[in-house]
Design a protein with these regions (language model features):
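GST-like domain detector, emphasizing the conserved glutathione-binding G-site
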Residues: 1-124
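Amphipathic alpha-helical packing segments from all-alpha helical-bundle domains
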Residues: 124-140
Length: 141
């Protein structure tokens, strides 16, 4: 298997770390969805990271789906999730908050680093900043 995407993405990074922690062998191909569009499109027309390429050429996208697959193929007893239903539910809740914080942080980067200054929306940025702040507040509670 090959994991495609750059480790500066929180979604690629969480997938990379999960595969390592589960002891699943994989190759990492560091391609940017911004700077390597033709190369990425040849692998995955969606140009979405992370992308997992199976040995048969099939492609899977979305870090949560890839991680679910990695958990499925991991050695018995190797799961990163707790067995207790209450602890499992809490871990899912924390993971959802972490993903929301990562997603909103990526939105902020797009708005402040990628979008031209004359096209930036201060109201949108204020909303995203509030969502980031509130999400981290929930994580720290």
């Amino acid at each position: 298997m090959k994991l495609v995407g750059m480790l500066d993405s929180p979604f690629v990074r969480r997938t990379f770390i999960t595969a390592r922690m589960l002891g699943i062998p994989f190759e990492h191909q560091s391609l940017s969805v911004f700077r390597n569009i033709p190369e990425f499109r040849a692998i995955n027309p969606l140009v979405k990271a992370p992308t997992l390429v199976f040995d048969d050429g099939e492609v899977m996208v979305d870090s949560s789906q890839i991680i679910a697959w990695l958990e499925h193929i991991a050695a018995p007893g190797k799961s990163l999730w707790p067995v207790d239903p209450g602890r499992y539910r809490r871990c899912l809740q924390l993971t959802s908050l972490g993903l929301a914080a990562a997603e909103k942080s990526v939105h902020r980067v797009y708005e402040t680093k990628v979008r031209p200054k004359e096209c930036r929306d201060p109201d949108w940025l204020e909303r995203v900043d509030g969502q980031i702040r509130d999400t981290y507040g929930l994580l720290e509670a």
